[in-house]
């Protein structure tokens, strides 16, 4: 902008286009179907419709695209949050191991990936404490799993239920201590 130069790029990485573009022109086949700012293009479900992708596989706030996984009965319960569960989700997806994720806040950075990749997600509303109902629901799912993984290292007043869930998995003998 400062030099008065326009740069035209052809980007297929939506998250990169979202971060570096002032304006985006979307091509649908051989025609430009929409031109706008990243905020205009990526809000709503336009991108999902343009590319024919399912709602859960694209996160409009981050531009992330997730490969869909099979929604089978979970074998592993991942006790995550604050992003630490993401590498575990991706590994389990590569291994084609169905998993459950929880307890997550609805606004957690992991929610997009969890909704797309996990067979089941146990969550609570954003900015609300994890209540006994969520903990009991998570325990019921965990009881059906072969193992549990807890990459969380820190617990606080709002996610204390995840510590209880980790301890519950440990007492059942299914917690993988090495992740």
Report each predicted region and the residues it spans.
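A short, surface-exposed alpha-helical micro-motif characterized by mixed small hydrophobic
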Residues: 17-19
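A short, gly/pro- and small-residue-rich
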Residues: 160-175
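A short, acidic, amphipathic alpha-helical segment used as a generic capping/interface helix at domain edges
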Residues: 132-141
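ABC ATPase nucleotide-binding domains
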Residues: 51-132, 150-151, 156-159, 177-178
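Helical segment within the ABC ATPase nucleotide-binding domain
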Residues: 1-3
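H-loop/switch region of ABC-family ATPase nucleotide-binding domains
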Residues: 11-12
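Conserved switch/coupling elements of ABC/ABC-like ATPase nucleotide-binding domains
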Residues: 25, 29-40
